[in-house]
Amino acid sequence: MKIGTRAVDLPCLSNRFAAMSDLILHHYDFSNFAEKVRLALGFKGLAWHSVIIPPIAPKPDLVPLTGGYRRTPVLQVGADLYCDTRLIVRELERRFPAPTLFPPAQAAMADAIAYWAENRLMRPITLYTSGMNLDHLPAGLQADRSVMRGLPPPDDATMRRAALRNAPLVRAQLPDVESMLADGRDWLVGPLPCVADLAVYHPLWFFTARTELLAHELAPYPHIAAWMSRVRAFGHGRSTAMAAARALEVARNTEPLAPEPSTPWPEDPPLGAEVRIRADDYGRDVVSGELVHAGIDEIVLRRDDPLVGTVVVHFPRLGYDLRAA
């Protein structure tokens, strides 16, 4: 596959699609974090099943799988559920290492850029674009997002004021992205595309995910425009629609993978303990279960649900608060 001006070797798609069909992505169309994963699936040439979930609570067909976690997206492989794109993309890399999204020479810088993009860059973009596109948002979306952050639901005037406050914070950072590409490079960190390209792309994609109203904010940046075209060319792989009930059935009829061996830190609860985990920023719904893996990068809980039986839910270590039940 040719991406931009450099060749990136992708696997032979016709030989791999059938084998990858156990990947199930729970997502919705205008989720920017879901777009990050969809592009990762495309970059790696994978086939996957698409389960569309509501953008707001309740999510009755998702929470039996995750135990309460309701952020988007969630990757399901049999009876294993992977939460948070930081972990999802790494799990795709572990299962399908070629072509890599983590070139060793670029990995440390890529992680640093991804953290900036998905925190300091994305938050003001979200507030700016949401406040300026109020007429195009699903009913109840802003109230739902406020609940996820423990805030009272905002009225339209409050949202518009937030948009105006955050517009300068967005404009202050866009030149940084343009400058990363100003030397003519194709990708942000080095000669190869990597996870940093996905992490910076999806907040900028959010400008026009619903409407073209704010497309003018990106217009002054030709390097960004060309780079976004290269990332967009990854595509989304090949998806097949799946009913939510079928995804529940898959989990119910599949044994989860045995957890990888791990040695928890002394401060962690011991393996086998009943624990609680939740995100440390927003969407802090608690998931409870038995701790079966506590590694440097990943926390894994085993839990039982009357609808799906035994499932295993995976979280990244960073960004999550793990405690004894």
Model-identified regions with their sequence ranges:
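Short linear/disordered segments characteristic of secreted peptide precursors
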Residues: 8-10
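GST-like domain detector, emphasizing the conserved glutathione-binding G-site
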Residues: 12-147, 156, 160, 269, ...
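GST-like fold's C-terminal all-alpha helical module
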Residues: 117-233
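Mixed-charge, Lys/Arg-rich low-complexity intrinsically disordered regions
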Residues: 237-271
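A short beta-strand micro-motif
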Residues: 274-280
